[in-house]
Amino acid sequence: MSKSPVAIIILDGFGKRAETVGNAVAQANKPNFDRYWADFPHGELKAAGLDVGLPEGQMGNSEVGHTNIGAGRIVYQSLTRIDKAIEEGEFQENKALNNAFTHTKENNSDLHLFGLLSDGGVHSHINHLVALLETAKDKGVKNVYIHAFLDGRDVAPQSSLEYLETLQKAISDLNYGAIATVSGRFYAMDRDKRWERVEKAYKAIVSAEGEKFEDPIELVKASYANDKNDEFVVPAIITKDGKPVATVKDNDAVIFFNFRPDRAIQLSNAFTDKEWDHFDRGADHPKNIKFVTMTLYNPSIDAEVAFEPIEMKNVIGEVLSNEGLSQLRIAETEKYPHVTFFMNGGRNEEFPGENRILINSPKVETYDLQPEMSAYEVTDALVEDIKNDKHDAIILNFANPDMVGHSGMLEPTIKAIEAVDENLGRVVDLILEKGGSAIIFADHGNSETMSTPEGKPHTAHTTVPVPVIVTKKGVTLREGGRLADVAPTMLDLLGVKKPAEMTGESLIQK
């Protein structure tokens, strides 16, 4: 039977900004997007700050965006939850955190804090690290050591010195704690099974393998002199009197303070997985450690969780499933967790009638080297699926504008957007041919802002609104939409009643 599918098409990191300087979206040749914009109802969506459950003025990101899209409601994010817990005193009494503190006291051992050192608010926040230091001191933990992962991606490429200085000031004010290792997130926070990267971070933390520096500031400056920005700082060891400040040893406790799971899973597994076979962890692999993660990274990780997920009922996948509609989730590796786990409200398993296609992202050092990434392969697989009338609903993500946008390089990002546009045309024209419709939009901004006002590369997400197109003639879109309104719009196009839990509203004016 022929199907007329309704698709959610996410152009990841494709924001809307009037200024064309440093704007890859505006400068790209994108005839298909421009044609849909001209021919169909369009507008913009809010995708940052309070509109997606983040603090006011906080840029959106893919995890937050896809969670809000799938939920059809504003979902208060981990960043906001943890901030609130610190403010209201719940953080200090958190059971999992206190279990880590107790473990060190009972074993006369050390506490180690792992995480991304910035105020980017995408994976972590430096305020949470400072709160952990204050709380550990209050609770009588004797020694605490920080293993700092440098950002340079959700914040400026060379901004780690200011975060290290903020951290050193907190250490000095509290007269408590020390930085033990420093690593660029490229190594410590890989999510693409590049195990040789994770191994470098792991061995720095456990075996003090790596270059030695007495001062983290000098370490970063040496890295810059070597043309390696924060993200790419090779894992290195901080020493005192010629000896490593600290390594993770038997009976220690670890708190991984990243709240976003995807880039914290592999390193967590390196410490906790009993069946590990990705690299030789060596004789130093610590035994009997208490491992605590800020949020649930993956149910398979042997760790206590400080902030358990809030279960959500009636996300888009569940509603489609309950209606007996078939649905496809499709993306390349970089954004596959977003169209599955995050879109399903933090649920790994499929709903009945939900199918998934994962296309591998290319194995390149950085995506500016291959701006098209796997967009053509994703599209080939999807076109085949649509031609064969497989699914009633489709959720697709094109990763390129975001992943190449993070390079801070304008030309490759323009190429990335042009590749996406070509593939967007193939998908949407086929859907229209089948009598279906698509909601084309982005989860957050990035590629529309590739340079700072000073003309330096801009690699982070932004707070700008994102464009939205609904490829259905004869309807009008209301203004003031946000990401939470996308799922209700899909249901509207499918003729399905929106459940009470979805507080978002269809973008189509009645």
From Swiss-Prot:
Binds 2 manganese ions per subunit. Keywords: Glycolysis, Isomerase, Manganese, Metal-binding. Pathway: Carbohydrate degradation; glycolysis; pyruvate from D-glyceraldehyde 3-phosphate: step 3/5. GO terms for molecular function: manganese ion binding; phosphoglycerate mutase activity. SUPFAM superfamilies: 2,3-Bisphosphoglycerate-independent phosphoglycerate mutase, substrate-binding domain, Alkaline phosphatase-like. It catalyses: (2R)-2-phosphoglycerate = (2R)-3-phosphoglycerate. Signal peptide: none annotated. GO terms for cellular component: cytosol. One of its GO terms (biological process) is glucose catabolic process. It comes from the Bacteria. The active site is at residue 62. Belongs to the BPG-independent phosphoglycerate mutase family. This is 2,3-bisphosphoglycerate-independent phosphoglycerate mutase. It comes from Listeria monocytogenes serovar 1/2a (strain ATCC BAA-679 / EGD-e). The lineage of its organism: Bacteria, Bacillati, Bacillota, Bacilli, Bacillales.
